[in-house]
Amino acid sequence: LLTAPYVLFRDDTTGSVTLFTDPEEMIVAHEAEEFFPALARMQAARAAGKYLTGYMSYEAGYLFEKKLAPLVSAQRDVPLLCFGVFTSPAGDVEQASPGPLINADDFLSDIKPGWTLEDYRKQFSKLHQHLRQGDCYQANLTMPVHARWHGDPLTAFWSLIERQPVKYGALVNLGGPVILSRSPELFFAVQDGWIETHPMKGTIKRGASPAQDAELIVGMMKDEKTLAENRMIVDLLRNDISRIGEVGTLDVPKLFEIETYPTVHQMVSHVRAKLLPDMTVEDVFAALFPCGSVTGAPKMRAMEILHDLEIGPRNVYCGAIGMISPDGDMRFSVAIRTISLFEDGGATFNVGGGIVFDSTADAEYDECLLKAKFATGEKRLV
């Protein structure tokens, strides 16, 4: 039987499972002043031949920019970062196998969006004013969805796979909230000295038939708004990666590819470069975090604007979940489609989308509700 603390990763496309149990130590930063010492401890653990797995909350991104650092609130109920230090992955992954699966609909109840359509229209209107004034040209406006959770997170994790298989499933149970993530988006992977990121920007609802799906995909590939949204984030990530990549190695091997999931089609591009030698964990995160696909562009100004418009901190949502290997390889997902499960039975997940000049409030709100289906299924949101 699997008992906390542990971290479980699953790639639903291959069925591969990686499990980490019994951490030697925990590296946790709740306060801003603990954050950079925690990153230094992570670097030291990696240098000592250890694995690290866990998460970094979205608000940690403020600390990499002096101008944004004051935006980190002192009263946080979720750590800025939380990582376990492990000797190796667990040899026995069977202990993470599911017992009898549940109906995923039974896991969450009393599901309520943080904003009504009317609330959303008001915040959208304020953001659109910034777009009109040229303060930013894209921003990823998000809202929380609150619920109650029941039962066992591990069983729920396996039960939700059927609803939406993804490459970057994760269950992080390291104390504090349990993080159940069904992310389809790679934030970055470092392998053999190369870094690659797969920004996902552009979403459309699945069709009712294969023929309709094919039609929708063709339409998506021709839609100027979708292409512009994706291109903006590709340019932003090219800029971010160039800060830690060797000159002349930056490449976009894939542009505007469509990935299909049970409820949506998503547009994805790939950006890669050869890492400069001796890059630390801090160097990589300082250049890239948080992912441009969940902030906007220009990144810093978009983050300021979103801080003023959104309800409270995003916490783990839109942060990063992943692992760091002793050989320098790393892999982190963007923590979208991610539910935080609190001890008092409360659950929170967020939904959002990129807003550009020709976006409309009602269509974007509908997209938010569509993205919530990974957790809600066909349940109506109250």
Predicted regions and their residues:
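Extended alpha-helical targeting/anchoring segments
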Residues: 1-382
